[in-house]
Amino acid sequence: MTPGTQSLFFLLLLLTVLTVVTGSGHASSTPGGEKETSATQRSSMPSSTEKKVVSMTSSVLSSHSPGSGSSTTQGQDVSLAPATEPASGSAATWGQDVTSVPVTRPAPGSTTSPAQDVTSAPDTRPALGSTAPPVHGVTSAPDTRPTLGSTAPPVHGVTSAPDTRPTLGSTAPPVHNVTSASGSASGSASTLVHNGTSARATTTPASKSTPFSIPSHHSDTPTTLTSHSTKTDASSTHHSTVSPLTSSNHSTSPQLSIGVSFFFLSFHISNLQFNSSLEDPSTNYYQELQRDISELILQIYKQGDFLGVSNIKFRPGSVVVQSTLAFREGTTNVHDVEAQFNQHKTEAASRYNLTISDVSVSDVPFPFSAQSGAGVPGWGIALLVLVCVLVALAIVYLIALAVCQCRRKNYGQLDIFPARDAYHPMSEYPTYHTHGRYVPPSSTNRSPYEKVSEGNGGSSLSYTNPAVAATSANL
Protein backbone atom coordinates (compact mmCIF):
# COMPACT_ATOMS: atom_id res chain seq x y z
CA MET A 1 0.00 0.00 0.00
CA THR A 2 1.41 3.31 -1.02
CA PRO A 3 2.06 6.11 1.51
CA GLY A 4 -0.71 8.24 0.02
CA THR A 5 -3.28 5.49 0.49
CA GLN A 6 -2.08 4.89 4.05
CA SER A 7 -2.45 8.55 4.95
CA LEU A 8 -5.97 8.60 3.49
CA PHE A 9 -7.07 5.57 5.55
CA PHE A 10 -5.41 6.99 8.66
CA LEU A 11 -7.24 10.26 8.19
CA LEU A 12 -10.62 8.54 7.76
CA LEU A 13 -10.02 6.33 10.83
CA LEU A 14 -8.98 9.30 12.93
CA LEU A 15 -12.03 11.27 11.82
CA THR A 16 -14.37 8.38 12.67
CA VAL A 17 -12.90 7.95 16.15
CA LEU A 18 -13.02 11.68 16.82
CA THR A 19 -16.67 11.92 15.75
CA VAL A 20 -17.75 8.95 17.86
CA VAL A 21 -15.94 10.20 20.97
CA THR A 22 -17.11 13.83 20.89
CA GLY A 23 -20.45 13.55 19.09
CA SER A 24 -22.25 10.95 21.14
CA GLY A 25 -23.75 11.78 24.55
CA HIS A 26 -22.45 9.64 27.34
CA ALA A 27 -24.71 8.77 30.27
CA SER A 28 -23.48 6.89 33.32
CA SER A 29 -25.75 5.11 35.79
CA THR A 30 -24.95 5.13 39.50
CA PRO A 31 -26.08 2.53 42.08
CA GLY A 32 -28.75 4.90 43.33
CA GLY A 33 -30.20 5.31 39.87
CA GLU A 34 -28.83 8.80 39.17
CA LYS A 35 -28.37 9.82 35.54
CA GLU A 36 -26.48 12.88 34.42
CA THR A 37 -26.23 14.04 30.82
CA SER A 38 -23.73 16.56 29.54
CA ALA A 39 -24.69 18.62 26.55
CA THR A 40 -22.04 19.92 24.21
CA GLN A 41 -22.97 22.53 21.67
CA ARG A 42 -21.26 22.70 18.36
CA SER A 43 -21.75 25.05 15.50
CA SER A 44 -21.84 24.11 11.86
CA MET A 45 -19.98 26.28 9.37
CA PRO A 46 -19.68 25.65 5.60
CA SER A 47 -16.32 24.52 4.34
CA SER A 48 -15.19 23.20 0.95
CA THR A 49 -11.67 22.14 1.70
CA GLU A 50 -10.34 19.40 3.84
CA LYS A 51 -7.84 20.47 6.40
CA LYS A 52 -5.37 18.46 8.34
CA VAL A 53 -6.18 17.92 11.97
CA VAL A 54 -3.59 19.76 14.04
CA SER A 55 -4.95 19.17 17.51
CA MET A 56 -7.36 16.68 18.88
CA THR A 57 -10.37 17.84 20.88
CA SER A 58 -11.43 15.73 23.76
CA SER A 59 -14.43 16.46 25.85
CA VAL A 60 -13.48 15.39 29.28
CA LEU A 61 -16.43 13.90 30.99
CA SER A 62 -15.54 13.40 34.61
CA SER A 63 -17.79 10.49 35.45
CA HIS A 64 -16.90 8.95 38.78
CA SER A 65 -19.26 6.69 40.61
CA PRO A 66 -19.55 7.34 44.37
CA GLY A 67 -17.98 4.82 46.65
CA SER A 68 -19.52 2.67 49.28
CA GLY A 69 -21.66 4.42 51.84
CA SER A 70 -22.65 7.26 49.52
CA SER A 71 -26.27 8.25 49.17
CA THR A 72 -27.32 9.52 45.74
CA THR A 73 -30.80 10.77 45.05
CA GLN A 74 -32.41 10.13 41.71
CA GLY A 75 -32.89 13.21 39.46
CA GLN A 76 -36.43 14.34 38.85
CA ASP A 77 -38.05 16.00 35.85
CA VAL A 78 -34.95 15.95 33.63
CA SER A 79 -35.84 16.80 30.02
CA LEU A 80 -33.51 16.78 27.04
CA ALA A 81 -33.97 18.87 23.94
CA PRO A 82 -34.23 17.03 20.61
CA ALA A 83 -30.98 16.42 18.78
CA THR A 84 -30.70 17.96 15.36
CA GLU A 85 -28.22 16.42 12.95
CA PRO A 86 -27.19 17.69 9.54
CA ALA A 87 -27.51 15.49 6.50
CA SER A 88 -24.98 12.83 5.68
CA GLY A 89 -22.08 14.02 3.64
CA SER A 90 -22.41 17.64 4.60
CA ALA A 91 -19.30 19.51 5.53
CA ALA A 92 -19.51 20.35 9.21
CA THR A 93 -16.99 22.70 10.69
CA TRP A 94 -16.36 22.61 14.39
CA GLY A 95 -16.46 26.05 15.91
CA GLN A 96 -13.38 27.36 17.57
CA ASP A 97 -15.34 28.55 20.56
CA VAL A 98 -16.09 25.17 22.09
CA THR A 99 -16.31 24.75 25.83
CA SER A 100 -16.67 21.47 27.60
CA VAL A 101 -18.65 21.49 30.81
CA PRO A 102 -17.61 19.03 33.52
CA VAL A 103 -19.93 16.54 35.05
CA THR A 104 -19.52 16.77 38.78
CA ARG A 105 -20.17 13.82 41.01
CA PRO A 106 -20.08 13.69 44.81
CA ALA A 107 -17.25 12.04 46.60
CA PRO A 108 -17.71 8.90 48.71
CA GLY A 109 -19.88 9.49 51.74
CA SER A 110 -21.54 12.59 50.31
CA THR A 111 -25.25 13.11 49.90
CA THR A 112 -26.55 14.71 46.73
CA SER A 113 -30.03 16.17 46.62
CA PRO A 114 -32.15 15.77 43.50
CA ALA A 115 -32.02 18.35 40.75
CA GLN A 116 -35.52 19.28 39.74
CA ASP A 117 -36.76 20.82 36.50
CA VAL A 118 -33.37 20.77 34.78
CA THR A 119 -33.44 21.51 31.05
CA SER A 120 -30.35 20.85 28.98
CA ALA A 121 -29.30 22.77 25.88
CA PRO A 122 -30.13 21.36 22.44
CA ASP A 123 -27.62 18.98 20.95
CA THR A 124 -26.48 19.70 17.42
CA ARG A 125 -23.95 17.27 16.03
CA PRO A 126 -22.75 16.40 12.52
CA ALA A 127 -23.34 13.07 10.87
CA LEU A 128 -20.77 10.42 10.36
CA GLY A 129 -18.52 10.91 7.42
CA SER A 130 -18.64 14.69 7.46
CA THR A 131 -15.43 16.59 6.99
CA ALA A 132 -14.38 18.76 9.88
CA PRO A 133 -11.56 21.31 9.92
CA PRO A 134 -9.08 21.34 12.76
CA VAL A 135 -10.06 22.78 16.08
CA HIS A 136 -7.54 25.01 17.84
CA GLY A 137 -7.24 26.03 21.46
CA VAL A 138 -9.88 23.78 22.94
CA THR A 139 -9.81 23.83 26.73
CA SER A 140 -11.31 21.11 28.83
CA ALA A 141 -12.90 22.04 32.13
CA PRO A 142 -11.37 20.58 35.26
CA ASP A 143 -12.94 17.91 37.37
CA THR A 144 -14.70 19.43 40.31
CA ARG A 145 -16.09 17.25 43.04
CA PRO A 146 -17.42 18.07 46.51
CA THR A 147 -15.52 17.41 49.65
CA LEU A 148 -15.96 14.17 51.56
CA GLY A 149 -19.06 14.16 53.75
CA SER A 150 -20.57 17.29 52.23
CA THR A 151 -24.26 17.72 51.55
CA ALA A 152 -25.49 19.52 48.47
CA PRO A 153 -28.86 21.30 48.65
CA PRO A 154 -31.36 20.66 45.86
CA VAL A 155 -31.29 22.85 42.78
CA HIS A 156 -34.71 23.93 41.56
CA GLY A 157 -35.71 25.48 38.32
CA VAL A 158 -32.29 25.59 36.62
CA THR A 159 -32.67 26.33 32.91
CA SER A 160 -29.87 26.36 30.37
CA ALA A 161 -29.19 29.66 28.64
CA PRO A 162 -29.69 30.05 24.89
CA ASP A 163 -26.85 29.86 22.40
CA THR A 164 -25.52 33.36 21.98
CA ARG A 165 -22.49 33.52 19.71
CA PRO A 166 -20.70 36.84 19.36
CA THR A 167 -17.99 37.48 16.81
CA LEU A 168 -14.53 36.10 17.42
CA GLY A 169 -12.45 38.40 19.52
CA SER A 170 -15.43 40.35 20.80
CA THR A 171 -16.06 40.78 24.50
CA ALA A 172 -19.37 39.55 25.77
CA PRO A 173 -20.83 41.32 28.80
CA PRO A 174 -21.46 39.15 31.85
CA VAL A 175 -24.92 37.97 32.68
CA HIS A 176 -26.19 39.34 35.97
CA ASN A 177 -29.26 38.73 38.09
CA VAL A 178 -28.61 35.01 38.32
CA THR A 179 -30.26 33.28 41.24
CA SER A 180 -29.09 29.78 42.07
CA ALA A 181 -30.59 27.14 44.37
CA SER A 182 -33.85 28.98 45.04
CA GLY A 183 -32.11 32.13 46.18
CA SER A 184 -29.78 30.49 48.72
CA ALA A 185 -27.14 27.86 48.06
CA SER A 186 -23.79 26.99 49.64
CA GLY A 187 -20.99 27.74 47.24
CA SER A 188 -23.25 27.65 44.18
CA ALA A 189 -21.84 28.95 40.92
CA SER A 190 -23.81 30.28 38.01
CA THR A 191 -22.24 29.76 34.62
CA LEU A 192 -22.15 32.80 32.38
CA VAL A 193 -23.01 32.24 28.74
CA HIS A 194 -20.41 33.45 26.25
CA ASN A 195 -19.53 32.16 22.78
CA GLY A 196 -21.76 29.10 22.72
CA THR A 197 -21.22 27.89 26.27
CA SER A 198 -24.02 25.84 27.73
CA ALA A 199 -25.02 26.95 31.22
CA ARG A 200 -25.16 24.40 33.96
CA ALA A 201 -25.46 25.10 37.64
CA THR A 202 -23.25 22.90 39.79
CA THR A 203 -23.40 22.98 43.55
CA THR A 204 -20.29 21.81 45.36
CA PRO A 205 -20.45 22.77 49.04
CA ALA A 206 -17.61 22.02 51.39
CA SER A 207 -17.86 19.87 54.48
CA LYS A 208 -20.04 21.39 57.21
CA SER A 209 -20.40 24.66 55.35
CA THR A 210 -23.11 27.11 56.30
CA PRO A 211 -25.33 28.32 53.45
CA PHE A 212 -25.62 32.02 52.88
CA SER A 213 -27.96 34.11 50.80
CA ILE A 214 -26.72 35.37 47.44
CA PRO A 215 -28.39 38.64 46.38
CA SER A 216 -29.94 38.62 42.96
CA HIS A 217 -28.12 41.75 41.83
CA HIS A 218 -24.61 40.39 42.30
CA SER A 219 -22.69 37.56 40.61
CA ASP A 220 -19.23 36.34 41.61
CA THR A 221 -18.77 33.77 38.81
CA PRO A 222 -15.34 34.10 37.22
CA THR A 223 -15.40 34.18 33.41
CA THR A 224 -12.48 33.74 31.02
CA LEU A 225 -12.89 34.92 27.41
CA THR A 226 -10.40 33.99 24.67
CA SER A 227 -10.46 34.07 20.87
CA HIS A 228 -10.22 30.32 20.52
CA SER A 229 -12.00 28.86 23.51
CA THR A 230 -14.12 29.90 26.44
CA LYS A 231 -13.62 28.32 29.82
CA THR A 232 -16.29 28.86 32.42
CA ASP A 233 -15.38 27.88 35.93
CA ALA A 234 -18.82 26.95 37.12
CA SER A 235 -17.95 25.52 40.48
CA SER A 236 -16.55 27.01 43.62
CA THR A 237 -15.87 25.30 46.91
CA HIS A 238 -15.98 27.07 50.23
CA HIS A 239 -13.74 25.58 52.88
CA SER A 240 -14.81 27.87 55.68
CA THR A 241 -18.00 28.51 57.51
CA VAL A 242 -19.68 31.62 56.15
CA SER A 243 -22.06 33.51 58.34
CA PRO A 244 -25.43 34.47 56.84
CA LEU A 245 -25.42 37.75 54.96
CA THR A 246 -28.19 39.97 56.10
CA SER A 247 -29.16 43.34 54.74
CA SER A 248 -30.49 45.74 57.31
CA ASN A 249 -31.25 49.40 57.30
CA HIS A 250 -29.19 51.12 59.95
CA SER A 251 -30.54 54.59 59.30
CA THR A 252 -31.81 56.16 62.47
CA SER A 253 -34.16 59.06 62.56
CA PRO A 254 -33.07 61.84 64.89
CA GLN A 255 -35.10 62.22 68.04
CA LEU A 256 -36.62 65.66 68.42
CA SER A 257 -37.07 67.08 71.87
CA ILE A 258 -40.11 69.37 71.98
CA GLY A 259 -40.88 71.66 74.89
CA VAL A 260 -44.50 71.56 76.05
CA SER A 261 -46.51 74.25 77.80
CA PHE A 262 -49.61 73.31 79.80
CA PHE A 263 -52.60 75.49 80.54
CA PHE A 264 -55.42 74.84 82.98
CA LEU A 265 -58.82 75.64 81.42
CA SER A 266 -61.95 76.01 83.54
CA PHE A 267 -65.43 77.19 82.56
CA HIS A 268 -69.05 76.85 83.66
CA ILE A 269 -71.92 75.29 81.74
CA SER A 270 -74.90 77.18 83.03
CA ASN A 271 -77.65 75.29 81.22
CA LEU A 272 -76.75 71.96 82.82
CA GLN A 273 -77.15 70.78 86.37
CA PHE A 274 -74.64 68.65 88.18
CA ASN A 275 -75.91 65.25 89.25
CA SER A 276 -74.51 62.00 90.53
CA SER A 277 -73.91 60.69 86.99
CA LEU A 278 -71.09 63.20 86.52
CA GLU A 279 -69.29 61.69 89.49
CA ASP A 280 -69.04 58.26 87.89
CA PRO A 281 -66.87 58.12 84.72
CA SER A 282 -68.52 54.86 83.67
CA THR A 283 -71.96 56.40 83.09
CA ASN A 284 -73.16 57.29 79.62
CA TYR A 285 -73.99 60.87 80.56
CA TYR A 286 -70.47 61.46 81.83
CA GLN A 287 -68.88 59.95 78.72
CA GLU A 288 -71.12 61.86 76.29
CA LEU A 289 -70.46 65.20 77.95
CA GLN A 290 -66.74 64.49 78.10
CA ARG A 291 -66.73 63.60 74.40
CA ASP A 292 -68.57 66.83 73.51
CA ILE A 293 -66.13 68.93 75.50
CA SER A 294 -63.16 67.20 73.84
CA GLU A 295 -64.54 67.78 70.33
CA LEU A 296 -65.26 71.41 71.15
CA ILE A 297 -61.74 72.07 72.38
CA LEU A 298 -60.21 70.29 69.37
CA GLN A 299 -62.28 72.43 67.00
CA ILE A 300 -61.36 75.66 68.76
CA TYR A 301 -57.62 75.03 68.81
CA LYS A 302 -56.97 73.77 65.30
CA GLN A 303 -53.46 75.17 64.89
CA GLY A 304 -50.53 72.82 64.63
CA ASP A 305 -49.04 74.02 67.90
CA PHE A 306 -51.91 72.48 69.88
CA LEU A 307 -50.94 69.03 71.13
CA GLY A 308 -54.08 67.84 72.92
CA VAL A 309 -56.41 68.00 75.88
CA SER A 310 -56.48 65.76 78.92
CA ASN A 311 -57.78 65.38 82.45
CA ILE A 312 -61.33 66.57 81.82
CA LYS A 313 -63.28 66.65 85.08
CA PHE A 314 -66.66 67.91 86.29
CA ARG A 315 -67.63 69.37 89.64
CA PRO A 316 -70.75 71.01 91.07
CA GLY A 317 -71.65 74.64 90.42
CA SER A 318 -74.09 74.12 87.60
CA VAL A 319 -71.41 72.10 85.81
CA VAL A 320 -67.83 73.24 86.15
CA VAL A 321 -65.49 71.77 83.55
CA GLN A 322 -61.79 71.52 84.29
CA SER A 323 -59.25 70.36 81.71
CA THR A 324 -55.59 70.65 80.80
CA LEU A 325 -54.41 71.91 77.39
CA ALA A 326 -50.98 71.14 75.93
CA PHE A 327 -49.21 73.43 73.43
CA ARG A 328 -45.73 73.66 72.02
CA GLU A 329 -43.51 75.66 74.25
CA GLY A 330 -43.23 79.31 73.33
CA THR A 331 -46.05 79.31 70.75
CA THR A 332 -48.83 80.80 72.86
CA ASN A 333 -49.63 82.28 76.25
CA VAL A 334 -52.48 82.42 78.74
CA HIS A 335 -54.18 85.44 77.21
CA ASP A 336 -54.16 84.02 73.68
CA VAL A 337 -55.63 80.71 74.84
CA GLU A 338 -58.41 82.44 76.75
CA ALA A 339 -59.19 84.87 73.94
CA GLN A 340 -59.37 82.11 71.35
CA PHE A 341 -61.74 80.09 73.51
CA ASN A 342 -64.03 83.08 74.09
CA GLN A 343 -64.26 83.70 70.35
CA HIS A 344 -65.69 80.24 69.71
CA LYS A 345 -68.12 79.99 72.59
CA THR A 346 -71.02 80.57 70.22
CA GLU A 347 -70.15 77.40 68.32
CA ALA A 348 -70.63 75.41 71.49
CA ALA A 349 -74.02 77.00 72.08
CA SER A 350 -75.23 76.25 68.56
CA ARG A 351 -73.73 72.84 67.96
CA TYR A 352 -73.58 71.15 71.36
CA ASN A 353 -76.31 73.17 73.13
CA LEU A 354 -73.91 74.34 75.82
CA THR A 355 -73.99 77.76 77.43
CA ILE A 356 -70.43 78.53 78.53
CA SER A 357 -69.47 81.25 80.97
CA ASP A 358 -66.75 82.21 83.43
CA VAL A 359 -63.84 81.06 81.28
CA SER A 360 -60.51 81.10 83.07
CA VAL A 361 -57.08 79.97 81.87
CA SER A 362 -53.99 79.61 84.01
CA ASP A 363 -50.48 78.38 83.40
CA VAL A 364 -49.53 75.12 85.09
CA PRO A 365 -46.13 73.42 85.17
CA PHE A 366 -47.41 69.89 84.69
CA PRO A 367 -50.48 68.40 83.07
CA PHE A 368 -51.38 66.14 85.94
CA SER A 369 -51.39 66.97 89.61
CA ALA A 370 -49.42 64.52 91.65
CA GLN A 371 -51.91 62.30 93.40
CA SER A 372 -50.79 61.44 96.88
CA GLY A 373 -51.03 57.84 97.84
CA ALA A 374 -52.63 56.37 100.93
CA GLY A 375 -50.05 58.09 103.14
CA VAL A 376 -49.70 57.74 106.91
CA PRO A 377 -52.95 57.85 108.93
CA GLY A 378 -53.50 60.39 111.69
CA TRP A 379 -53.11 57.94 114.52
CA GLY A 380 -49.80 56.86 113.05
CA ILE A 381 -48.53 60.42 113.05
CA ALA A 382 -49.71 60.92 116.66
CA LEU A 383 -48.02 57.72 117.74
CA LEU A 384 -44.81 58.78 116.05
CA VAL A 385 -44.85 62.15 117.84
CA LEU A 386 -45.51 60.47 121.19
CA VAL A 387 -42.62 58.08 120.76
CA CYS A 388 -40.32 60.96 119.88
CA VAL A 389 -41.35 62.87 123.02
CA LEU A 390 -40.81 59.84 125.25
CA VAL A 391 -37.40 59.22 123.78
CA ALA A 392 -36.45 62.85 124.39
CA LEU A 393 -37.59 62.69 128.02
CA ALA A 394 -35.69 59.46 128.57
CA ILE A 395 -32.54 61.05 127.24
CA VAL A 396 -32.95 64.08 129.53
CA TYR A 397 -33.54 61.84 132.56
CA LEU A 398 -30.46 59.76 131.87
CA ILE A 399 -28.33 62.88 131.53
CA ALA A 400 -29.62 64.29 134.84
CA LEU A 401 -29.04 60.99 136.61
CA ALA A 402 -25.47 60.81 135.40
CA VAL A 403 -24.76 64.39 136.52
CA CYS A 404 -26.15 63.77 140.01
CA GLN A 405 -24.12 60.63 140.44
CA CYS A 406 -20.93 62.44 139.54
CA ARG A 407 -21.61 65.35 141.94
CA ARG A 408 -22.41 63.02 144.88
CA LYS A 409 -18.96 61.50 144.80
CA ASN A 410 -17.34 64.92 145.41
CA TYR A 411 -19.40 65.87 148.59
CA GLY A 412 -18.70 65.05 152.33
CA GLN A 413 -21.17 63.72 154.99
CA LEU A 414 -22.87 65.64 157.85
CA ASP A 415 -23.31 63.44 160.93
CA ILE A 416 -26.09 64.87 163.09
CA PHE A 417 -25.75 62.31 165.89
CA PRO A 418 -22.13 61.27 165.97
CA ALA A 419 -22.59 59.13 169.09
CA ARG A 420 -22.69 55.45 168.72
CA ASP A 421 -25.90 55.01 170.68
CA ALA A 422 -29.23 55.94 169.40
CA TYR A 423 -30.35 58.41 172.13
CA HIS A 424 -28.55 61.24 173.93
CA PRO A 425 -30.15 63.43 176.61
CA MET A 426 -30.00 67.11 176.07
CA SER A 427 -28.00 67.64 179.21
CA GLU A 428 -25.06 65.92 177.69
CA TYR A 429 -24.68 68.55 175.02
CA PRO A 430 -23.15 71.89 175.79
CA THR A 431 -24.99 75.11 175.10
CA TYR A 432 -22.96 76.00 172.04
CA HIS A 433 -22.30 72.54 170.87
CA THR A 434 -22.98 71.77 167.30
CA HIS A 435 -25.15 68.75 166.93
CA GLY A 436 -23.18 67.22 164.15
CA ARG A 437 -19.86 66.82 162.53
CA TYR A 438 -18.50 67.11 159.04
CA VAL A 439 -16.76 64.12 157.63
CA PRO A 440 -14.67 64.99 154.59
CA PRO A 441 -14.78 62.70 151.60
CA SER A 442 -12.77 59.52 151.82
CA SER A 443 -12.16 60.02 155.56
CA THR A 444 -12.86 57.26 158.11
CA ASN A 445 -11.35 58.75 161.30
CA ARG A 446 -13.77 60.14 163.85
CA SER A 447 -13.33 63.65 165.13
CA PRO A 448 -11.93 63.99 168.69
CA TYR A 449 -14.64 66.49 169.57
CA GLU A 450 -17.38 63.95 169.27
CA LYS A 451 -16.13 61.93 172.19
CA VAL A 452 -18.36 62.28 175.26
CA SER A 453 -16.87 61.42 178.62
CA GLU A 454 -18.46 58.74 180.69
CA GLY A 455 -20.05 59.56 184.07
CA ASN A 456 -21.14 63.00 182.99
CA GLY A 457 -18.14 65.12 183.96
CA GLY A 458 -15.97 62.58 185.58
CA SER A 459 -13.22 63.26 183.22
CA SER A 460 -11.01 66.31 183.15
CA LEU A 461 -12.23 67.07 179.77
CA SER A 462 -15.84 67.20 180.81
CA TYR A 463 -17.75 70.42 181.04
CA THR A 464 -20.47 71.18 183.60
CA ASN A 465 -23.01 73.87 183.18
CA PRO A 466 -23.36 75.74 186.49
CA ALA A 467 -26.82 77.03 185.78
CA VAL A 468 -28.12 73.59 185.16
CA ALA A 469 -26.42 72.30 188.27
CA ALA A 470 -27.95 75.01 190.49
CA THR A 471 -31.35 74.39 189.18
CA SER A 472 -31.05 70.70 189.89
CA ALA A 473 -29.98 71.37 193.46
CA ASN A 474 -32.87 73.64 194.12
CA LEU A 475 -35.25 71.05 192.92
UniProtKB/Swiss-Prot annotation:
Region (Disordered): 23-252, 435-460
Chain ranges passing through the membrane: 381-401
Biased composition (Low complexity): 54-75, 180-190
Topology feature Cytoplasmic, residues: 402-475
Sequence repeat start and end residues: 86-105, 106-125, 126-145, 146-165, 166-185
Keyword Ribosomal protein: no
Location of the region described as Required for interaction with beta- and gamma-catenins in the Swiss-Prot/TrEMBL record: 453-461
Chain positions of motif Interaction with GRB2: 423-426
Signal peptide per UniProt: 1-23
Residues annotated as domain SEA: 259-368
Glycosylation: residue positions: T93, T99, S100, T104, N177, N195, N249, N275, N353
Assigned GO CC terms: apical plasma membrane; cytoplasm; nucleus
Entries under SMART domains matching the protein: SEA
Pfam families: SEA (PF01390)
Post-translation changes: Probably both N- and O-glycosylated (in repeat region).
Region annotation Interaction with P53: where it falls in the sequence: 412-448
Span(s) of short sequence motif Required for interaction with AP1S2: 463-466
Complex and partners: The alpha subunit forms a tight, non-covalent heterodimeric complex with the proteolytically-released beta-subunit. Binds directly the SH2 domain of GRB2, and forms a MUC1/GRB2/SOS1 complex involved in RAS signaling. The cytoplasmic tail (MUC1CT) interacts with several proteins such as SRC, CTNNB1 and ERBs. Interaction with the SH2 domain of CSK decreases interaction with GSK3B. Interacts with CTNNB1/beta-catenin and JUP/gamma-catenin and promotes cell adhesion. Interaction with JUP/gamma-catenin is induced by heregulin. Binds PRKCD, ERBB2, ERBB3 and ERBB4.
UniProt protein name: Mucin-1
